[in-house]
């Protein structure tokens, strides 16, 4: 039906007859000549219809937005005054000789030009229209190029594309599972995989050595802008490779990806320990474009007569950190109050501050409600450590270390945006040496997952001091977004059982939930390691989209619903009976 894509017609085709198909992007009658912008996935081309062909001209006059049409015509150069350098096809136009309406279009329920006025609900309900917008189409085309590159790279480096099951068994991986009832085993359920973690480890135990898969994963969790109930991972696992070798291979893939698709050289990725990232940036995924850093000042404040500072300064689990913002002395009291409310979202109970108005004036040049609690030497040392200058403001976070990290880390990001401090376009890094466990509610939880190997300890040493253990794990971070995370896996049955016990999973529960894994570990398991990238986040970053929904063809809403298909929906009652399932009525709300 066509000879060329609309966006591919160029000066080399001048004089040629072309056949194009696509949608009417815009049609306008200018002095008896009709100009038609025809659009397909590759772009736009201008088609001109003269009244010399009255039958064709009449058809062109009847066109409205989003009619699906076929055009036949001859390519010609545009007059110099009409060349459009903003269009890929802006040097040429097609003189229309024939026109066929393939399918008419009703008036649209949403605007494809002024899409900012469309609600998110409408965009998802009429997703097939929203995806016609060039911006959306180009993102999905770019996504296809990313997956094509990944497959070529993986294939070229000896990795095998192997599928793993979608119907599997529920395992504790941090989020709720989507459950699928079994008809043949009434009362029992499959789970949709949160990741192929255990199956890819079993593939290493099976001897396949290098595996990858671009795979759907499912998590029934509360949604945010960067979360979806179903998402896509670039999943990788290797045998007989160290963590450094896995990082080298996957870093090379991402660097080559950016170079090929965006002509961007990311350079070598620096490595930073988890401790350093949390201390300097208050985050395990720091945005290095932001030059602001947290500075520890607790040692200066242990003896001050201000409990807000001295309390955390003398608490083993506490921290007092300072954050200097260049030019921040211009902030009004209301703006400071707004920042105080902002850090309160992250658990902070307040936000002390100090404006540096005139260093030459000594203490008199400092403006702060807490200055009266600090002697001149302390103030001078705080200014020296933070490298504050005239016109700066210093904010203080004082609380438990985790609260300070989260609240001041968030303030660092917000201030960096508000004061337009971000430097450079792309700043990747590796974050390594994560804690093996974190403690909450009197028990230990795995920071990554229960199959991550500790670094440099025996099973006995791990069990004796789990809170001190460091995992052989690594996260790739780009511009404050975790692109992917991985680790060396446990390949020893005793170590795996020890980790289960530390996590409160006794031998009986471990056998019931992970018996197949523990069995497999008895038969010559190779050392193995891997990593998984979030494809949606990667494409979101590379295309500059504001949400992963804008790089997915048919995403869900923030309430995990699909307005297009009205999913989820009610099941057929007969099917529920066959499955042995009864739906309980909603309990009435208690007054």
From Swiss-Prot:
<dbReference type="InterPro" id="IPR004364">
    <property type="entry name" value="Aa-tRNA-synt_II"/>
</dbReference>
<dbReference type="InterPro" id="IPR006195">
    <property type="entry name" value="aa-tRNA-synth_II"/>
</dbReference>
<feature type="binding site">
    <location>
        <position position="489"/>
    </location>
    <ligand>
        <name>L-aspartate</name>
    </ligand>
</feature>
<dbReference type="InterPro" id="IPR002312">
    <property type="entry name" value="Asp/Asn-tRNA-synth_IIb"/>
</dbReference>
<dbReference type="InterPro" id="IPR047090">
    <property type="entry name" value="AspRS_core"/>
</dbReference>
<keyword id="KW-0030">Aminoacyl-tRNA synthetase</keyword>
<comment type="similarity">
    <text>Belongs to the class-II aminoacyl-tRNA synthetase family. Type 1 subfamily.</text>
</comment>
<feature type="binding site">
    <location>
        <position position="228"/>
    </location>
    <ligand>
        <name>ATP</name>
    </ligand>
</feature>
<dbReference type="InterPro" id="IPR004115">
    <property type="entry name" value="GAD-like_sf"/>
</dbReference>
<dbReference type="InterPro" id="IPR004524">
    <property type="entry name" value="Asp-tRNA-ligase_1"/>
</dbReference>
<keyword id="KW-0547">Nucleotide-binding</keyword>
<keyword id="KW-0963">Cytoplasm</keyword>
<keyword id="KW-0067">ATP-binding</keyword>
<keyword id="KW-0436">Ligase</keyword>
<dbReference type="Pfam" id="PF01336">
    <property type="entry name" value="tRNA_anti-codon"/>
</dbReference>
<keyword id="KW-0648">Protein biosynthesis</keyword>
<dbReference type="GO" id="GO:0005524">
    <property type="term" value="F:ATP binding"/>
</dbReference>
<dbReference type="Pfam" id="PF00152">
    <property type="entry name" value="tRNA-synt_2"/>
</dbReference>
<dbReference type="GO" id="GO:0003676">
    <property type="term" value="F:nucleic acid binding"/>
</dbReference>
<dbReference type="InterPro" id="IPR047089">
    <property type="entry name" value="Asp-tRNA-ligase_1_N"/>
</dbReference>
<dbReference type="InterPro" id="IPR029351">
    <property type="entry name" value="GAD_dom"/>
</dbReference>
<dbReference type="GO" id="GO:0005737">
    <property type="term" value="C:cytoplasm"/>
</dbReference>
<feature type="binding site">
    <location>
        <position position="219"/>
    </location>
    <ligand>
        <name>L-aspartate</name>
    </ligand>
</feature>
<feature type="binding site">
    <location>
        <position position="173"/>
    </location>
    <ligand>
        <name>L-aspartate</name>
    </ligand>
</feature>
<dbReference type="InterPro" id="IPR012340">
    <property type="entry name" value="NA-bd_OB-fold"/>
</dbReference>
<dbReference type="InterPro" id="IPR045864">
    <property type="entry name" value="aa-tRNA-synth_II/BPL/LPL"/>
</dbReference>
<feature type="binding site">
    <location>
        <begin position="219"/>
        <end position="221"/>
    </location>
    <ligand>
        <name>ATP</name>
    </ligand>
</feature>
<comment type="subunit">
    <text>Homodimer.</text>
</comment>
<feature type="binding site">
    <location>
        <begin position="534"/>
        <end position="537"/>
    </location>
    <ligand>
        <name>ATP</name>
    </ligand>
</feature>
<dbReference type="Pfam" id="PF02938">
    <property type="entry name" value="GAD"/>
</dbReference>
<dbReference type="GO" id="GO:0006422">
    <property type="term" value="P:aspartyl-tRNA aminoacylation"/>
</dbReference>
<comment type="function">
    <text>Catalyzes the attachment of L-aspartate to tRNA(Asp) in a two-step reaction: L-aspartate is first activated by ATP to form Asp-AMP and then transferred to the acceptor end of tRNA(Asp).</text>
</comment>
<feature type="binding site">
    <location>
        <position position="448"/>
    </location>
    <ligand>
        <name>L-aspartate</name>
    </ligand>
</feature>
<dbReference type="InterPro" id="IPR004365">
    <property type="entry name" value="NA-bd_OB_tRNA"/>
</dbReference>
<feature type="binding site">
    <location>
        <position position="482"/>
    </location>
    <ligand>
        <name>ATP</name>
    </ligand>
</feature>
<feature type="region of interest" description="Aspartate">
    <location>
        <begin position="197"/>
        <end position="200"/>
    </location>
</feature>
<protein>
    <recommendedName>
        <fullName>Aspartate--tRNA ligase</fullName>
        <ecNumber>6.1.1.12</ecNumber>
    </recommendedName>
</protein>
<dbReference type="GO" id="GO:0004815">
    <property type="term" value="F:aspartate-tRNA ligase activity"/>
</dbReference>
